[in-house]
């Protein structure tokens, strides 16, 4: 696995104060694979590091500074992932049966989708590609139940 961005340098690059809690939150985000909810990130922190409201504020700051991406599940839950050179933009898959959302490989340049032009005067801030359907585990379970 590639070496991730150094937490203190990331914080300094956006001009915010480096604190132990922010370093621990960034390291927790970098250590995991895939998407996190604010609650899951809070659960990965040592007790007393930061309250849940602080985690939400920090994630909002990372999104605002374009260091994290926010993905909204069909259930309305917000998921976050780092948006750095080690984690380029990529599509996701959301299972409608179990609710799991996970990362798919990034499109290769020759596979990139062509989107229609944005209306004149509009400014695009982000594009999100989420495949929705039934994951392989849920499909296998359904097929097994159908055979019984």
For every predicted segment, state its role.
Residues 2-15:
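Short, Lys/Arg-enriched N-terminal segment that forms or immediately precedes the first helix
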Residues 16, 30-33:
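Short helix-capping/hinge SLiMs at alpha-helix to coil transitions
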Residues 18-21:
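Short helix-coil-helix linker/hinge
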Residues 23-28:
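Pre-recognition alpha-helix immediately N-terminal to the DNA-recognition helix
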Residues 35-43:
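Short acidic, hydrophobic short linear motifs in intrinsically disordered regions
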Residues 43-50:
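Short helix-coil junctions and helix-kink-helix linkers
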Residues 55-65:
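Basic amphipathic alpha-helical segments that dock to polyanions
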Residues 65-148:
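Non-DNA-binding regulatory cores of transcription-related proteins
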């Amino acid at each position: 696995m590639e070496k991730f961005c150094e937490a203190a340098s990331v914080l300094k690059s956006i001009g915010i104060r480096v604190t132990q809690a922010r370093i621990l939150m960034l390291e927790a985000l970098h250590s995991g694979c895939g998407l996190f909810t604010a609650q899951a990130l809070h659960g990965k922190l040592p007790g007393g590091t930061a309250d849940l409201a602080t985690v939400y504020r920090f994630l909002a700051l990372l999104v605002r500074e374009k260091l994290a991406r926010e993905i909204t599940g069909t259930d309305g839950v917000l998921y976050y992932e780092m948006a750095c050179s080690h984690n380029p933009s990529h599509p996701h898959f959301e299972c409608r049966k179990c609710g799991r959302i996970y990362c798919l490989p990034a499109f290769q340049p020759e596979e990139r989708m062509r989107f229609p032009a944005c209306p004149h005067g509009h400014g695009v801030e982000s594009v999100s590609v989420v495949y929705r359907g039934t994951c392989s585990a849920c499909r296998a379970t359904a097929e097994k139940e159908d055979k019984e």
